[in-house]
Amino acid sequence: TGAVSVVKVDEIQKQGENNPVKALQGRVPGMNITADGNPSGSATVRIRGIGTLNNNDPLYIIDGVPTKAGMHELNGNDIESIQVLKDAASASIYGSRAANGVIVITTKQGKKGQIKINFDASVSASMYQSKMDVLNTEQYGRAMWQAYVNDGENPNGNALGYNYNWGYDANGNPVLHSMSLSKYLDSKNTMPVADTDWFDEITRTGVIQQYNLSVSNGSEKGSSFFSLGYYKNLGVIKDTDFDRFSARMNSDYKLIDDILTIGQHFTLNRTSEVQAP
């Protein structure tokens, strides 16, 4: 196929993204990725725009096997290479399913040499870059009084329980002397009045933990690769989180004087997620 983009996996792994496809944003021309903001890192991928009213997702090929599983379930540390096929010629290889483009992912294999053991761990934090300034109870009451006066209406007719002592000065301009608010918001006196910053109440500093262990080995007769991974993301919205446990075992061996080669690619993923309401 002609239009092929090859992405350096080392650069993606440095980002620490849960979803390896999400890390392709800005690296592949003509590829648009929209994340939903949830801790799982799930994203919508468009390679050739929107061409149908039905499914516009690209075809994912992992080690030669087509899949529709979310890429946030794949451990990015297990990836050896990523190729994005964008032109129509890919349909001659993968059929009509490649109409929206193809993302080919190859996972790691053992390499010839001594046994290699890798372990990495990382902890990072996520938070809002900027916070919206909100009004407290008094500031909101003053703003509402001004709005009622500007509309020529009686501010004491509000439905929130604000009581205003106001009048006009010598020049006829409205002046607010004082204001009061009922102790409770409801008639049954169960909801007390308070200065509540709801942004602070529903958000927190998110914590992302990632641990990966891999063992690889290779010789002239074969190779093997084994990995374990754990990823946990406590979202910035309270009570949202994502957990993923992954295990992978890739191996291939040459038999009968290299006439026959057998191999297997085995992966196991367990995920749990609580999304924002």
Per-region residue spans from a language model:
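Outer-membrane beta-barrel translocator/channel fold
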Residues: 271-277
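Short, small/polar-rich motifs associated with maturation and membrane association
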Residues: 1-249, 253-269
